[in-house]
Amino acid sequence: MDLDRITRPLRLAKGSYQPESGMGCVMNAISYIGGDTQVTDFPATSARPLAAFVQLCNDLLAGPDGYLSSESSFLALELGWQTVGTAVVTDTVIHAWVGELLTSPAWGVVQYADNVAVEAIFDIADLHRALASGEMPPIAAWHSADCAARAVCATLAGAGVYAVRAAYQSTALVDTERCETLDAVTGNALRCHELATKSTGADRIVEVTRDAIRSWRRLAQLDHPSHIESASVDNALDT
């Protein structure tokens, strides 16, 4: 792939695309490649939570000048490409994925929590998993878990705050607008990971993002995407 060609219509950089700037994040590039009417941080073919994970990787991979190197650009594009085709999934997939977002041993936010916070997060994750498996936990159970997590959160600091916040905000997925709630849950989970791994630079966040994307695709039973194709990028960016 001739990554230098991206610098003509769009050079990968920290932040979001601004018209006429010639700069944008990797999800802006995916949006452009996919033919969205307007270049956006959340391409139509990509699940919003996964796009948010990749955006954070993009920003952490940027150099001191705000731009991504050719090597970092390729890594970011590979991650972004893995989100293509993930936008449309069932509520069952959403709940199962949130359960993993909270408590997966590899990438769940529970790893940054202690003691009663761990219990509060697992209680909520168990409700999501139950719902994903076809059970219908009573609203009272969701409310009780929400209240318990909020009480715990008031005693915490640092990454643990955002871990528990992601958990209790996710209880609203059962009876409110899914998009806005999922954005809030994902945002808190990302902030949790960012605070807990800030000493490792982008490496750990890239690893977590790969896990998050793999989890989503597995739960949705989506085919494993191929590697990003040079022709797809070159044709889409041909001006």
Residue ranges and their predicted role:
Residues 1-239:
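Short, glycine-biased loop/turn motifs at secondary-structure junctions and
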